């Protein structure tokens, strides 16, 4: 959420930022003007309400003086005035809450402002590659992951559909174990070498948590909601970031770095017809998440560090990848800047996203009221938040299957994962 004071003072800059994100000039200006008008109405109302409260307080004091002077008529007149003001104030306080909610809702729907070095563009075609690691091999016999998995008898989409419908997968045997091994390897790397603290968070959260990280109110159609009103997490970013909601942290203890391996649940409402075969786009999938809570001065360096931590996963696995910086039109709602890491899939003959690492500034912190106090400071400041995939486990499984497939249909297990697989070096049909 953006600071309304900043919006008032930088209206044209916000319009420009919204245009960079793909909004038309008229829509962008309407968004900004509506927020400023709502704030003006709220401030005007607050002034009137404060004046009424001052009048009530002054009249209440005069009642005592009138009674002391024996002027009962004046005292009764003042009592009537106080009663009238009391009713006005009660109505005014209700209106104040409505105006607060109106402004909050408008601000909650305005996306974050891209940093100056983010490339301006419309969509993924305008993203800019910044580095490429590893050789993208393309054997002429390469198959896609679902062909490999079904041929091995370890990946079952038909039974998954019978159980749950489209966009689900049943993994069995050594392929299920390989996915588990990937998640364990990632957690071990991030906790023992990268300094992240492992967390096992709830998978069901309240509205406030999703508001804090920016999924609500704008993107509710992308989520699954339970009958009791809780939401299934679309990413562990939600519970991990909200650990500091409504807290004032000790600045000396920043940065806080959290990681979690959780299932994630997404409706994929806007993905009809995309990646309908295989595991690339599922309603349920595992992901290792990285979250950092830091101060403004350290946030950009932390962003580079987090991205390097995610890249290290792919380096250790021996998977070719490239890292791109997203353009303004392709960035997420709450991000100031995002790096996507895309892994090479020889079966698809292309790179596909496996991690997205974003710096959000104080955008989420304002929604969560998450602050810190630096040593010697009386004033608490908003923290800066970052999040990234470290990495998507299901997509890592796909990448291992396609990059380590053999011409006979077997899958060689990356050396780094063999200890997690009981020393197994290859997955074959009998697995």
UniProtKB/Swiss-Prot annotation:
Residues that, per the record, bind ATP: 266-268, 353-356
Its UniProt entry gives the catalysed reaction(s) as: tRNA(Ser) + L-serine + ATP = L-seryl-tRNA(Ser) + AMP + diphosphate + H(+); tRNA(Sec) + L-serine + ATP = L-seryl-tRNA(Sec) + AMP + diphosphate + H(+)
A single GO molecular function term of this UniProt record: serine-tRNA ligase activity
* GO terms for cellular component: cytoplasm
Q: List the pathway annotation.
A: Aminoacyl-tRNA biosynthesis; selenocysteinyl-tRNA(Sec) biosynthesis; L-seryl-tRNA(Sec) from L-serine and tRNA(Sec): step 1/1
Any idea of its EC number? 6.1.1.11
UniProt: L-serine binding residues: 235-237, 289, 389
List the keywords (alphabetical).
Answer: Aminoacyl-tRNA synthetase, ATP-binding, Cytoplasm, Ligase, Nucleotide-binding, Protein biosynthesis
PROSITE patterns reported in the protein's UniProt record: AA_TRNA_LIGASE_II (PS50862)
Q: What class of enzyme is it?
A: ligase
Family annotation (Pfam families): Seryl_tRNA_N, tRNA-synt_2b
Q: One of this protein's GO BP terms?
A: selenocysteine biosynthetic process
What family does the Swiss-Prot or TrEMBL record give for this protein? Belongs to the class-II aminoacyl-tRNA synthetase family. Type-1 seryl-tRNA synthetase subfamily.
Domain comment as written in the entry: Consists of two distinct domains, a catalytic core and a N-terminal extension that is involved in tRNA binding.
Q: Subunit structure of this entry?
A: Homodimer. The tRNA molecule binds across the dimer.
Q: Which HAMAP family match?
A: Ser_tRNA_synth_type1 (MF_00176)
- Job description of the protein: Catalyzes the attachment of serine to tRNA(Ser). Is also able to aminoacylate tRNA(Sec) with serine, to form the misacylated tRNA L-seryl-tRNA(Sec), which will be further converted into selenocysteinyl-tRNA(Sec).
What's the name of the protein? Serine--tRNA ligase
> Lineage of the native species?
Bacteria, Pseudomonadati, Pseudomonadota, Alphaproteobacteria, Hyphomicrobiales
């Amino acid at each position: 959420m953006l600071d309304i004071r900043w919006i008032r003072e930088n209206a044209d800059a916000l319009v420009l930022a919204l245009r960079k994100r793909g909004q038309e000039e008229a829509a962008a200006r309407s968004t900004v003007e509506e927020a400023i008008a709502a704030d003006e109405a709220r401030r005007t109302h607050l002034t009137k309400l404060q004046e009424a409260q001052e009048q009530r307080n002054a009249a209440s004091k005069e009642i005592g003086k009138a009674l002391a002077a024996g002027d009962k008529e004046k005292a009764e007149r003042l009592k009537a005035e106080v009663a009238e003001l009391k009713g006005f104030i009660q109505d005014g306080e209700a209106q104040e809450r409505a105006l607060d909610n109106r402004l909050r809702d408008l601000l909650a729907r305005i996306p974050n402002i891209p940093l100056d070095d983010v490339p301006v563009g419309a969509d993924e075609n305008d993203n800019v590659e910044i580095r490429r690691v590893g050789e993208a091999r393309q054997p002429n016999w390469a198959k896609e992951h679902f062909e490999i998995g079904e041929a091995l008898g370890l990946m079952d989409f038909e039974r998954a559909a019978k159980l749950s419908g489209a966009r689900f997968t049943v993994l069995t045997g050594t392929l299920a174990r390989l996915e588990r091994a990937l998640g364990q390897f990632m957690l071990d790397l991030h906790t023992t070498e990268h300094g992240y603290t492992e967390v096992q968070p709830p998978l069901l959260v309240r509205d406030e948590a999703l508001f804090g990280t920016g999924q609500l109110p704008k993107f509710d159609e992308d989520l699954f909601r339970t009958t009791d009103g809780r939401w299934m997490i679309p990413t562990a970013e939600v519970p991990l970031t909200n650990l500091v909601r409504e807290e004032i942290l000790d600045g000396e203890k920043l940065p806080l770095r959290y990681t979690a391996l959780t299932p994630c649940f997404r409706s994929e409402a806007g993905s009809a017809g995309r990646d309908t075969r295989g595991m690339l786009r599922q309603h349920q999938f595992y992901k290792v998440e990285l979250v950092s809570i830091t101060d403004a001065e350290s946030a950009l360096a932390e962003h580079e560090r987090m991205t390097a931590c995610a890249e290290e996963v792919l380096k250790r696995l021996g998977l070719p990848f490239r890292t791109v910086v997203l353009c303004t039109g392709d960035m997420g709602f709450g991000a100031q800047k995002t790096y996507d890491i895309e892994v090479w899939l020889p079966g698809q003959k292309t790179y596909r996203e496996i991690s997205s690492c974003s710096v959000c500034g104080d955008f989420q912190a304002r929604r969560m009221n998450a602050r810190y106090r630096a040593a010697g400071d009386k004033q608490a400041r908003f923290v800066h938040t970052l999040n990234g995939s470290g990495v998507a486990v299901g997509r890592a499984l796909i990448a291992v299957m396609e990059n380590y497939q053999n011409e006979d249909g077997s899958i060689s297990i990356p050396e780094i994962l063999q200890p997690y697989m009981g020393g197994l070096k290859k997955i074959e049909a009998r697995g």
